[in-house]
Amino acid sequence: TQGVSSAASDVYKRQLIIRMKTLLAKHRSIRKFRSEPIAPEVLQDMLEAASRASTCGNMQLYSLIVTQSRELREALAPCHFNQPMVTQAPCVITVCADVHRFSMWCEQRDAEPCYDNFAWFLNGVTDALLAAQNLCVEAEAHGLGICYLGTTIYTAEEIARILDLPKGVIPVTTIVVGHPDESPELTDRLPLDAVVHCEKYHHYTSSEIDELWAEKETSEETRRLLEENGLPNLAQIFTRNRYRAEDNLAISRNYFALLKKQGFFNN
């Protein structure tokens, strides 16, 4: 009986590993959603999965602001450049680094908090993003689609105002979640050699850089983008169109100002 039980357990483990590998390998960002709401028990599973993510000192230095009301999603939409998915998706989750809650607890226990500085902003960001990714994996396990919104840091001050964030709390990303209304192709990725280093950092040669990006640069999607943008190569699409120097500097200045306002620069 014990042997049968052990064999059954091994089969279950193998099936679980295969399912997890398949789930992670088929991830795609979804930008079109049906209006169907997320079942409360599914949302609860997602949030519980988020709460089990690794966290600095078991402090859970994050807050997940779950917005489902149409009114608030419409208020947030301009912060995300009015992308339709913000109002299409039934659930918008703003992920924040949060030292406010832990600091309050310390103060109420006669323990002086010391988390209003840049080091603890970084710890909060790490906690927040780990929780966010756990949430996304759980959502996809339920057959839902997700998309991270990088626009969060562009308009973080307005998001903080709309969501009434106190000092010690700052938005770091946003996730839209819902039932997919599209099935896009998988996007390409750089080969593992591009991102994995053995023992020490590998310093790339020019020819290695060419090789790592060769597949991306010769893809049909890249050819289409080059034609649309009238640019000679993929790198210039990033530097001249998508993420321009002047925009990057403006976003950085604005976010640094909000960090100071929210009390993260007492260094």
Regions found by a protein language model. Name each.
Residues R14-Y62, E74:
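N-terminal capping/interface segment
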Residues T22-S35, E107-R109, T174-N267:
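C-terminal helix-cap and adjacent tail motif
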